[in-house]
Amino acid sequence: MLNEEMKEVLRRNICYFATSTEDGKPNVIPVGLVEPIDNSRILLVDVKMNKTRRNLEENNAVALAVTDFEKLKAYQFKGKAKVVTEGELFEGAVKLAEERMKIRRERLERRIESESDPEMRKKVKEIAERKMKPKAAIVIEVKEVYPCM
């Protein structure tokens, strides 16, 4: 279901993760810690998904959207999600978060050096210094894929 191009688009871009309450009230959040596990599953790292986690307890039907403007590719993935808080998948989420957050900090530190606006520099510095600890891995079992571009 997921080909190599889709996997690369997921890894390189911010994704938008949609959940809903049992009665259908939607919630969408941006997610940067995303990694395809195999050809049918996608891992998201939960560092601050409070409302999303509550929604998943009520309704595990989800969608994940991503756009790569450089490659002119966009996809929507629909499926069922589960929350994992221990074991191999969770440990993989922790490792992914550590690797990606290190890269993120380095990028933000370079931006601080080049930023001329003092207020923006302060905001970027605050974001760079945040410590985000993974709370869980969210695993999406992909059932449908829709190309959007």
Question: Which residues does each predicted region cover?
Answer:
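Structured loops at beta-to-helix junctions and adjacent beta-edge loops in soluble globular domains
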Residues: 20, 67, 141-143
